[in-house]
Structures are given as structure tokens and as C-alpha cells.
Amino acid sequence: MKIFAIGMNYAAHNQELHGTLKRPDEPVIFTKADSAILNQGKPFFIPDHLGRIDYETEVVVRICRLGKNIPERFAHRYYDAVTVGIDFTARDLQKKASEAGQPWTICKGFDGSAAIGEWIPKEKFLDIQRIHFHLDINGKTVQEGCTSDMLYKVDEIIAYISQFFTLKTGDILYTGTPSGVGPVHIDDHLEGWLEERKVLEFNCK
């Protein structure tokens, strides 16, 4: 299983972290190790040696068939389910890596950094590009977004990635985070929502 993720895919998030609303010339793709997966309901143990850890709430899609060099017009055939995930990010390390022109492998891919919710068949949604989602921490909404605000749409991302990587059944794609990211703390209770469906819930320890 491969875990793909896209950075800088919501303009407001780009503004809050990078000071620009500009769409990147190409999708900003990174990957996580399979040991990054944190399944629904499992606690997230905050690493004590990585500095500040931020939540980044994202819509995630699941690849359902083998594909390479997929035309964008056919990309919708290659994923079958949607959920909410958290792309946990070691923010201090990310800043240092970015300033040094280094990759995000550690700051984005450490163990447990890819929380994943309950999968919902994509047919349950009228339009993948019009899904509202949000994250509650300790009962308070801290981040919310809509997939209509993506700079690169899901089908565009899949077509782009498949130029470089063969997509396989079970691969997953984190599609980017809106504005409102922030730190997590021990004893925080996180709940992720797709529309009115709670699909993700766990505690930080």
C-alpha cells in the first residue's frame, strides 16, 4: 500500500503558512510510509522528540484498481471510497526542512502521522468536489473546508500521480488541507466529519 498526499492544495492554507494564494505550477506530492497509518479509533501518541505537532484535516480517497498514465477524464473510475484523515505534521521540522530545501519525509511521514477514518462509498455523495468536512477537538470545531476549494481536483491529482507511480488497489490519497491548522496536545479528543457523518474519532496521548 502506498500513501500519497498533496500539499498546498487550498489557497487559504497556502496564505496562512506560505504567504501566497497562488496555485502551484504542479501538484505538490509527497508520500508517507505504511507505518504512518493510524486506524480509526486508535490513539495518537504525540512524539516527544519532534517539537510541535499540528493536525491537518483532509479528505482522503481510496484507490480501487490498477492504473498507470490515467487520463483525467477516466480518473473517477479509479477510486471507490472517501473518508476524513489527519495529516499530522511536525511543524518545526517542516519549517527547517523547507528552509534548507530538504524533503518532508520525517516531518510528514513518522509513525502514526496518517490518521484515517471509516470509508464511505463515493456513491453516497452527489459530487466529490462539493463535500464539506470539518474537525472538532474537545467538542469545538477548529478546522473546516469544502472540496470545491481545492486548487487541484481529485481527478487531476490522480491523473498527475499516475504519470510517475503505478496506482494499486488499496493505495490512498490525502487531498490537501484547508486553513485552520493548529497543534494537538495530550488528552485532546478529535472527531472528523464528512458532511453530517462522523467518520473519525480518537484521542491524543
Question: Where are the predicted features?
Answer:
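Extended, compositionally biased flexible segments
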Residues: M1-G85, R91-K95
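Catalytic-pocket segment enriched in acidic/His residues
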Residues: N9, H13-R23, I29, T83, ...
